[in-house]
Amino acid sequence: VMASEYLPTASANRYYGADGRLYGTDMNEYFIGDPFTEGGIICGTGAIVTAADGYLADTGSALRAYDITGSSPEELYRRVRNGQPVVVWVTISMADRRAAQGWYTENGDYVDWSTNDHGAVLIGYTDTTVTIADPISGRMEYSREQFEKVFSSRGNRCVVLE
């Protein structure tokens, strides 16, 4: 329901500007493409915050979504230890991130994506592993070291509900 009714979507709308750079829709604020097909590309934290806040407000929840991009893995583990799951930007199967492609937004920010970019929820950890709730694979356990490497490669992007 959250994706179908609350997630802001847009096409990439790519074009070359007079400066010769490729421009397109801000994927931080919109899911690019259709989230229900393989043609859907990706979205950033802004789109998830918008969707979550809309859903939470409509269900009467006092919770709100917050973009905490830039948080260290230790900060994520602290939140999980306190019972707060964290939406994290990672890759499918926690594989190394593939080569990225991207474009500039109208405000000049560069946004990129890779064919194995993915979002999931960090729900647990040990000294050597992390537990992820993955919308594709279900509950998965990965090497903590690999998670931290992949999380960093995705710009330490993350969202929490408070």
Protein language model annotation of sequence segments:
Residues 7-8, 20-22, 70-73, 92-96, ...:
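Solvent-exposed loop/turn segments at secondary-structure junctions
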Residues 87-89:
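Structural motif
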Residues 84, 116-118, 128:
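Envelope-exposed proteins and targeting segments
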Residues 56-57, 91-103:
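Short regulatory "switch" loops immediately downstream of catalytic or recognition motifs
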Residues 100-114, 123-162:
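Noncatalytic regulatory segments and standalone regulatory/sensor domains
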Residues 1-85, 159-162:
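Cysteine-nucleophile protease catalytic domains, especially the papain-like/related folds used
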